[in-house]
Structure formats: structure tokens, C-alpha cells
Amino acid sequence: MAPKTKSRLVDQPPSASSSEEQELVEESQEEEEQQSREEEGEEESGEETEEDEEPKTAHPVVKKPISQKLVQTPQKPQFSSESGSENGSGSDSEAESGNSLPSPSASDFTVKPNVAAKAATPSKPAAKRPQEAQKEKGKKKPKIAEEEEKKSPATPRSLWSDDDQLALLKGILEYKTVKGMEPSADMSAFHEFIRGKLQAEVSKSQISDKVRRLKKKFLTNVKDGEEPVFKKGQDFLIFEHSKRIWGAPGISNGGVKDNVNNTSNGKAKKTVEVKKSSEPKKSAKVSKPKDDEKQKEEEQQVAVKEVVKEDIVKGDQQDFQSKYPRLAASLETMSGLSTMYPNGSSLLKENMSLIATDKAKVLEEKWKKLEDDEAALMVKRLDFIAEHYRLVVDAMRGN
């Protein structure tokens, strides 16, 4: 009875193994079809993730260990012929199972994900917008307007121009000659007198302050007893008119120059000469270029002074003729003077302004009286001529 039980055990495994292999083949085919379908679905969609693919690949269940156990069962020796035949059939089944296709393993059916792991690229900083870049450039640029505001404000323009200063000095001289009094005695009258001759609108206080400063400037210039050197002709004109108003240096202001010249013992001159003689010769050699430059400057100053003096003379002549028109016209009536003295009329015209103002006034009044007398005489003469002609006409008519 024992051999029969053994033969049953040997006969059962081949049938079981063949059915299992067939099931495995069918499952493998189904899995291949399913895999192909999944690949087609992935190609169509292209958006499936790794999480969706992992459960699908976990379906195949391989029951390979059962066949391995059947193959690896030890064969016991059979003592009967039946056992030998059975053994032969068992060996045949084993041979058939050996010749059959190997059962697929679970690793053969695992689907590897095709999705490549993207390398984490470092995020680049976003490019700045053009508006932000322009704003930053605008911040970096220096603000010229702010720098200009920080600068110190421009100096205010001077109220008194050189022409107005000169006109003020001329007005003082004219006012003194016409009114015979100082402008400071009646500033209201002088303000009305001078305001039409100035370009700027000034008040009485501004005029008095300017006169005071001009006088102070003149006295400072003549303090050393020497005439200062001017770079502009206008400054020299102002100085000359100031001299005519407030006096020459050394006369009314006690200049050093006149005091030195008037000294009886001449000590001041000697001290100056001693200083000059005590200077070393080397310093004299070194100072030659300076002396040349100084000499050139003095020559230029002399030329400027001559030109300015000519302008002063011309200006004085025009002012004199405007103040005393009868004196100027009197030269034209002196026709006989040119025959007696050819250069007499031109000489009088050039030097007429040198006459003192009080004497010029007297001459002007005399010429005016003479013109009035001449006019009255002309009327008498015309009346006499008319009477003479009337008598002649009446005589011719026989009356």
C-alpha cells in the first residue's frame, strides 16, 4: 500500500505544475498587454506621475516557489515495477518541465519609471524691470538742482554804478555853483535837483550816505600825500571830481606830501635819502625788472591821465557852455577878433571853462544886459529907418 501512496504523490505535482505554469503564462500575457496599454496611455496623456505607475506594476504575483518545490522534491528509490514506471513517468514530466519555458520572475514584470529626475537648477534672480533700473540710475545721478540751491546766493547788484557816482559828483559841483551852498544844507532841494541826472532811483538818505562814503574814500586815497594809481579811467574821473569838491591833497586835508615839502630843516628828505643809500647793491640788481615794470605802469597811468583830462576838459566845456550860453555865443559874434588875432577865438573856447564860477556869472549877466540893450537899439533903429522911408515916399508923391 505504501508504493501506491507514493505514486499518487508523484503524479499530483506534474498536473499542478502544468496548470500553474499555464496560469503564469496567461498572467504574463495579460500583464504584457496591460503594460502595452499603459505605455500607450502614457504616450497619449504624458502627464502620469510616479505615484500612479507604482500600484499598476505591483499586480503580477508569481507563484514560482511552488514549482521550485516540486522540482526540488527528492526522489526515493522504487522497488516495484510500478514504482519504476511511475518513476519513469515522473522523469518524463520532469524532463517536460525542464524543457518548458522558465517561469517569469517578479523582477521581469517590474516597470521602471521613465520619468527622469530633473536636476534642481538654482533659480536665477529675476531681471530688474526697466522702470526700476531707471529709478536706480536716477538716484545715483547727482542732483544738479539741489547742488545749485545749496550754493551761496549771488551777491546783489550795486545800486550805484560808476556813471551815477560821477553824475553825483558833477551834480554837487553844479549845485554849489548855481545855488551857492553845500548840498548838505538842504538835502531835499539837492535830491530834487540831482534825481533827474541819475539812472537809479535813490532816496535822500542813500544820497547822503553815498556822498559821505565818496568823501571818505577820497580822503583815504590822499592820506599818504600821493595820488593813487587807478586801473580804470572812470575811477580816475571820480577821483578828480572829488578833488575839486573836497580839495587837493595836502591843502585842505593836511597831506603828508605838503608837510614834508614845507619843512624848514628838511629832516624828512634826509631820512628818505639815507634809506635809499643804505640799500645793498644786490637788491638794486634784483629790483631792476620790478623798476621796469613800475616805470611801464607809470607811463600807462600818465597816458590814461592825459586821456581822462581831455575828457574832463571836454565835459567841462560842454557843461560850461550849457550853463553860460551867452558867453559861448559871444565868441561867434567876435568876427573882428579873428582878423586881429587868428587863434584868439579857439584859445577862448578851450580855456573858457577855467573862469571861476562867480566871475562867469557876472559876465553872463553883462552879456544878457548887452543883448537886451542891443535888441532895444535894434527896435529904435528899425523905427528910425521906417520913419526915414516914410518921409522919402511922401516927398516922392508931392505931399
Swiss-Prot record:
Predominant localisation class: nucleus
Signal peptide positions on this chain: none
Disulfide linkage: none
Protein name: STOREKEEPER protein
Coiled-coil residue windows: none
Any one Gene Ontology cellular component term annotated for this protein: nucleus
Tissue: Expressed in tubers and in leaves treated with sucrose.
Disordered, as annotated region: 1-160, 250-301
Job of this protein: May act as a transcriptional regulator. Binds specifically to the B-box motif, a promoter element that is required for the tuber-specific and sucrose inducible expression of the patatin gene.
Gene Ontology BP terms: regulation of DNA-templated transcription
Family: Belongs to the GeBP family.
